Amino acid sequence: MEELKRQLDQMSEHNRKHYNYELSKLSEAEKQRLEALVVRMVKSGAKKPFEWAWSEFREGIPQWARFMVLKGMYQSAYDIPGNIDGSDEFDQETSNTYQEIVDKLGKEKLHQFLTSYAKSMLYNMIGIFDEGNFDYESNDSWLLMTQDRESGELGKPISGLHEDFLEFDQEIELS
């Protein structure tokens, strides 16, 4: 229960008392399960691993999966060099155009714009993932779900991504 203690020690006194009370009601097996979730969130780079793990533990929401989807999207938005390289697949002039814009605006200003633009596009995509199909003449829709890698068995839906996306940069360490 080392990581649980470490996370509780970082909380305000009020929150620490609340969660210590909640933890006192758990069995040893439940505490170990929560500890494993917290450790998993720490290893994933969450700034608030206890909150994410507690939500998964208490509400049954696949928060680790939600966190990893959002983290991957955010990392993609910040990967300007990788996105410029990848965009060459769609327009071979992209690298030249990028350099022309850098020469006029500067790299920092352009990267700030491109990151915001990428986040906006990703947020729109999240709406598609979260809401499914708006074509009401079709019975087909979709759902983002967890899946067991070994068995292929489908797990729980990964939904509500839009709820955390806008402020997600406060949830992770970006390198």
PLM features: residue spans?
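Acidic, proline/glycine-rich low-complexity IDRs
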Residues: 1-21, 95-96, 126-175
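Generic hydrophobic segment detector
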Residues: 52-56, 75-89, 112-116, 160-175
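Mature extracytoplasmic domains of secretory-pathway proteins
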Residues: 98-119
